[in-house]
Amino acid sequence: MSHSLWVEKYRPMDLSTYVGNEHLKEKVKVYLESEDVPHLLLFGKAGTGKTTLAKIVVNNIDCDYMYINASDENKVDDVRNKIKTFASSVGFKSLKVIILDECDYLTPNAQAALRNLMETFSKHCRFILTCNYVERIIDPIQSRCQSYKVVPPSKKEVAQQMVNILKEENCTFELDDIALIVNAGYPDIRRVINSAQRQVVPVYEDGLGGELQIDQSSVIQNNYKLQLLEMLSNGSKLNDIRQLIADNSISDYSELYRLLYDEVETYGKGK
């Protein structure tokens, strides 16, 4: 059983192992075959494979690339200096690609600087931007990109991926436990995999195998979101919904607001 992070160890390296988004994979395949890519804006919920897809692109075309996490480097100088240095330097390849992850964390001024850099270096440098909230990205950037919504694979596909990982790690498991973990973490695939790895207990002295032992209380604690969405879907009484929220120790209400915002289309249909 590996002690490295499973989310990194089993991150897909090419389109053949990337789960879901078949319609988007066809478009990316065309880019890979042409050895070129336009500016891309990949948006969607956290943990659904946006960054993975961006890395598949740069790892499968002939390019030099740089990765920037905008949640850590989101100020004007951070963006301008790092990108300008990379884009203007002499490279080994004719094409350069910059992955700007979580770009919805960029300040408005930083986004304005990014727009100018995209124009200045457009001949030989492409940008792949990822974000959870596309409405936070200024229009001039959106208009310069091919925008694609990355949707989560089905729960069945996520469960099968989890089964494959556990088998590869020589870990025993119950299918009901996998279903519980998937339901609690979906649609965030990263959260599902991390949750499973945390709850695997080594069963051999040599550390080469393990057993998935679910902490029911931990999973249920994280499952209040699913309960809340179900109650909203079923038209439960407002006091019951308030009680559910009160019964769960929620330290970050912004996460709850994001959940409701993300699911408004799903649970608002026909209302």
Regions found by a protein language model. Name each.
Residues K156, V163-K271:
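AAA+ P-loop NTPase domains with strong preference for DNA replication initiators
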Residues M1-V151, K156-E157, V163, K167, ...:
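P-loop/Walker A NTP-binding region and its immediately flanking N-terminal helices
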